[in-house]
């Protein structure tokens, strides 16, 4: 189909803005009502973890929403349209991530009763390692959140004329408001609403597109004829942007760095009432991720079929692949006022969920890692006040970063995954070393973090300066042959492939040799590269500088010790006796909310240490 002519610019109408405003108001109302119910938050633990009494289903949906931002709402359909349905293998990588998180990381974090994941790094290594982890997390999250807030605002502005500052300020202020007032409970329950909005938005687009294109059989047939049904791509070349191996290896490790050790996600599943419910939340999260990614990828296939003979990127109607989705919505719903506003609500629901999650998590890390160790005597009410103030500050900071994000290039999906992969990949390596390698010591993990960050940053910067050609990445061909003459305005002469401005490898004779090899690897491998470099370097330096003796490590810090203990923390109820606690298993014991300031991981005689040898199946 041709769609509108290139010179015409569709815009959102009053009904669309009304639907969008309704979504913002409902999100605000849910956040404020949940946050202020029952007297609000009485302690920092209430603010950051909901008192560790949250149910599995809302937490699971919140986990799914946290990284399914507007970046994914706009980016995944565009990538599926250009590279094919093989993007569905992302779901397999997410499944492996959920299983590894539930099996490896969740039991350790939950039984230690931590609010900040980086507390583990101090218990296992030293305060210096904890501070390094905290700072890396804050930098990564600030940059990621800035991209999440700014990129969709820019894209929608370019396609529809939606005022960029109005969208930035409305979403940023509302998100900061309910996160500051309501804390974790507000974030979780608004996420639930926003997941529903995202899914409904995708399904409405799918239904309308399939009907206009003659039914699902016709859509699949046309997609198959144009090589978009390509699930059986097992090319091992790491330079191919998306293959089975890219998602299974690179994708799994990127998602594991987000779910296994990322503060924003760990903070949610340790907020569940029991360890069993935390694992159930991960399963619910997996279902939510599958529905969102599969729906977005299928929208991408419908989008390709709709524009198969008149690619708007070739005609100049849009200037970047990320603009496909809003253009499609305006084209197929031009006679249905208000429905495009549902897509706008869908995109910004993702933005709100991610931004609120990040703000709450950054405030938690700052309180637990930077403030409480220096001011251990602060009263609970003062900590709540400080926590809310930090949420407001971080919300304002994210808006500032968003305003400075105009230099973003390479697509919003690639930009967001690059930030998380480069910085969070080495952190995943550090946590994995701590939990699996007893010999790893402080010099080793610090050296590994530095090496992993340097290598992953090196390849990311190299790929930015010398981007690979579309043939190397595996971009599938598109066409403008079916366009009317007056709609082909800005496409490059003789073009047969959609282009996002990335030069082919043969155009620049000054490109270094690494440009078409090392720098050309898929961005999904950046995190894996950082993780593996951190682990290899950390293990080597640890053995060279004197490995840590396993006997010197306290209980609950190594994954290998999980089978020999039921819990490493006391139950939440202060009235429970030691004998009552000992008969409870990990499924029944909630994470502890308070630990004496002097508790050390090796203090096995301390009343709060309940580890003992038992037979358990984990």
Curated annotation (Swiss-Prot):
Binding, Na(+) 2: 72, 144, 258, 416-417
Ranges that cross the membrane: 15-31, 57-80, 85-105, 131-157, 164-181, 190-208, 244-266, 279-301, 336-363, 387-408, 412-437, 442-465, 521-545
CDD domains according to UniProt: SLC5sbd_NIS
Glycan-carrying positions: 485, 497
Catalysed reaction equations from the record: iodide(out) + 2 Na(+)(out) = iodide(in) + 2 Na(+)(in); chlorate(out) + 2 Na(+)(out) = chlorate(in) + 2 Na(+)(in); thiocyanate(out) + 2 Na(+)(out) = thiocyanate(in) + 2 Na(+)(in); nitrate(out) + 2 Na(+)(out) = nitrate(in) + 2 Na(+)(in)
Modified residues (Phosphoserine): 551
InterPro entries: Na/Glc_symporter_sf, Na/solute_symporter, Na/solute_symporter_CS, SLC5A5, Sodium:Solute_Symporter_SSF
Effect of substituting residue 69 to A/C/D/K/T: Impairs sodium and iodide transport activity
Keyword annotations: Cell membrane, Cytoplasm, Glycoprotein, Ion transport, Membrane, Metal-binding, Phosphoprotein, Sodium, Sodium transport, Symport, Transmembrane, Transmembrane helix, Transport
Presence of the UniProt keyword GTP-binding in the record: no
A GO molecular-function annotation: protein homodimerization activity
Modes of activity regulation: Perchlorate inhibits iodide transport activity. Oxyanions inhibit iodide transport activity by blocking the binding sites for iodide and one of the sodium ions.
Region (Disordered): 587-618
Subcellular location: Cell membrane; Cytoplasm
Residues in the Extracellular compartment per record: 1-14, 81-84, 158-163, 209-243, 302-335, 409-411, 466-520
Effect of residue 417 to H/Y: Impairs sodium and iodide transport activity
Membrane topology classification: Multi-pass membrane protein
GO biological process: cellular response to cAMP; cellular response to forskolin; cellular response to gonadotropin stimulus; cellular response to Thyroid stimulating hormone; iodide transmembrane transport; iodide transport; sodium ion transport; thyroid hormone generation
Protein family according to the UniProt entry: Belongs to the sodium:solute symporter (SSF) (TC 2.A.21) family.
Summary of the function given for this chain in its UniProt record: Sodium:iodide symporter that mediates the transport of iodide into the thyroid gland. Can also mediate the transport of chlorate, thiocynate, nitrate and selenocynate.
NCBIfam families assigned: sss
The protein's name: Sodium/iodide cotransporter
Source species of the chain: Rattus norvegicus
The organism's taxonomic lineage, starting at the top: Eukaryota, Metazoa, Chordata, Craniata, Vertebrata
């Amino acid at each position: 189909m041709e769609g509108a002519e290139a010179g015409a610019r569709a815009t959102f109408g009053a009904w669309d803005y009304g639907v969008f405003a309704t979504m913002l108001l409902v999100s605000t109302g849910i956040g404020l009502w949940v946050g202020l119910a029952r007297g609000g938050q009485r302690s920092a633990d209430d603010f950051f973890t909901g008192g560790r009494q949250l149910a599995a289903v809302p937490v699971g949906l919140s986990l799914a929403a946290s990284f399914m931002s507007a970046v994914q709402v706009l980016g995944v359909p565009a990538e599926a349209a250009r590279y094919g349905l093989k993007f569905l293998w992302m779901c397999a990588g997410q499944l492996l991530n959920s299983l590894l998180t539930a099996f490896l990381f969740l039991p350790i974090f939950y039984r230690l009763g931590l609010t900040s994941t980086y507390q583990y790094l101090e218990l296992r290594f030293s305060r210096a390692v904890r501070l390094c982890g905290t700072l890396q997390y804050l930098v990564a999250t600030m940059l990621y959140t800035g991209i999440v807030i700014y990129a969709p605002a820019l894209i929608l502005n370019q396609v529809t004329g939606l005022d960029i500052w109005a969208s930035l300020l409305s979403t940023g202020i509302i998100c900061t408001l309910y996160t500051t007032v309501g804390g974790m409970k507000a974030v979780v329950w608004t996420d639930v609403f926003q997941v529903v909005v995202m899914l409904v938005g995708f399904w409405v687009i799918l239904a309308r597109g399939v009907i206009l294109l003659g039914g699902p059989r016709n859509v699949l047939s046309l997609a198959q004829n144009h090589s978009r049904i390509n699930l059986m791509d097992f090319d091992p070349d790491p330079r191919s942007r998306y293959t089975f191996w890219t998602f299974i290896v690179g994708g799994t490790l990127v998602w594991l760095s987000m779910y296994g050790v990322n503060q924003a996600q760990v903070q949610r599943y340790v907020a569940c009432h029991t360890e069993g419910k935390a694992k159930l939340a991960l399963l619910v999260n997996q279902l939510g991720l599958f529905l969102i990614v599969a729906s977005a990828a299928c929208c991408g296939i419908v989008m390709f079929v709709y524009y198969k003979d008149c690619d708007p990127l070739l005609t100049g109607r849009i200037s970047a692949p990320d603009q496909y989705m809003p253009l499609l919505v305006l084209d197929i719903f031009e006679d249905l006022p208000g429905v495009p506003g549902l897509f706008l609500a869908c995109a910004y629901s993702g933005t709100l969920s991610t931004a609120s999650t990040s703000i709450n998590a950054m405030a938690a890390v700052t309180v637990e890692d930077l403030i409480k160790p220096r001011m251990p005597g602060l009263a609970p009410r003062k900590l709540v006040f400080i926590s809310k103030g930090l949420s407001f500050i971080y919300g304002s900071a994210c808006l500032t970063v968003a305003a400075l994000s105009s230099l973003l290039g390479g697509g919003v999906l690639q930009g967001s995954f690059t930030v998380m992969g480069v910085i969070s990949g080495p952190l995943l390596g550090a946590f994995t070393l701590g939990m699996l390698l007893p010999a790893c010591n402080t010099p080793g993990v610090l050296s590994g973090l530095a090496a992993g960050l340097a290598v992953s940053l090196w390849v990311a910067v190299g790929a930015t300066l010398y981007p690979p050609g579309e043939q190397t990445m595996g971009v599938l061909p598109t066409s403008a042959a079916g366009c009317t003459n007056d709609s082909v305005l800005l496409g490059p002469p003789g073009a047969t492939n959609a282009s996002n401005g990335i030069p082919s490898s043969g155009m620049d004779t000054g490109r270094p040799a690494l440009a078409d090899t090392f720098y050309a690897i898929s961005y999904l491998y950046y995190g894996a590269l950082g993780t593996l470099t951190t682990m290899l370097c950390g293990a080597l330096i640890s053995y060279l500088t004197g490995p840590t003796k396993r006997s010197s490590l306290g209980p609950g810090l190594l994954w290998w010790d999980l089978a020999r203990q039921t819990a490493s923390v006391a139950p939440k109820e202060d009235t429970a006796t030691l004998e009552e606690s000992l008969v409870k298993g990990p499924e029944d014991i909630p994470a502890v909310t308070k630990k004496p300031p002097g508790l050390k991981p090796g203090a096995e005689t301390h009343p709060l240490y309940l580890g003992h040898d038992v037979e358990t199946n984990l």
